[in-house]
Amino acid sequence: MSFYVTNGGFSPIFVTAAVSALTLLAVVSWQVSTAVRERGAANSYVAPASGSDALVSDTAVNAALASDAQTEIGTAVIDGIVAKYLSLQEQGLYTPEVAAKTAEKMAETLKVPVPFRTYTAADIAVDADTSYARMLTYRRDLQVSLAPLLRNTQPEYEIFAYYVSTKDKKNLGKLQRAAQNYREAASSTARVTVPKDALAHHLGILNSMEEFAATLDALVANADDPFASAVLLRTYNQGEADVLTSFAVLAKYYREKKS
């Protein structure tokens, strides 16, 4: 997400961002189903048609899906897939095609919460003055405190897409720096004294920036795990939406303040 400065403050630039992010999510979800096929899921844990070996253990199933790049989040995703696959087997519905489609469908709906620092009213200095003049001072203060966001000139989903296609580690470095810029902006903004009637909006932008920074870090940490990446991209979409919403609400506060 990139930002530019206007007289009203910071405005998000996100033309085509939603479509592009969803396209990237589809690509990574496709990687999930491909990974299932490549790891021989059908041969590894399809129950025999007859005999005493009714079903192999969950451990064997996980081993069949595991890879060197597997992460904790990816393992959790696999656990869910395993449970679904075993259910398909028990119902006699399992085929390699159904299995791959199931993995893809699950990747489209699963989400994972990402822990992040949460600011509360107790963390913020509040001014009882809610005048128009005070709002103007507050807006100028925010333009200074949010300046680190101006370093984020390339959409984060685009950077991650380049990594997915090229595996160039420089792109992961860019994502890490973008996350740091969000945290730096949040830290500086937390030290701004806020008009009492803007406190809720202020907390909104602080927490959304921390959430988005944590999501970017999680994407970097799980970049080579297609299972985790597919889930985290949905978390990314939500985090980005939260940032955009928080700034839109703040802009509305500016507009509605009367002199």
Kindly label every feature range from the protein language model.
Residues 179-189, 216, 220:
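Extended amphipathic alpha-helical scaffold segments
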Residues 185-203:
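Short, solvent-exposed, charged loop/turn and helix-capping segments
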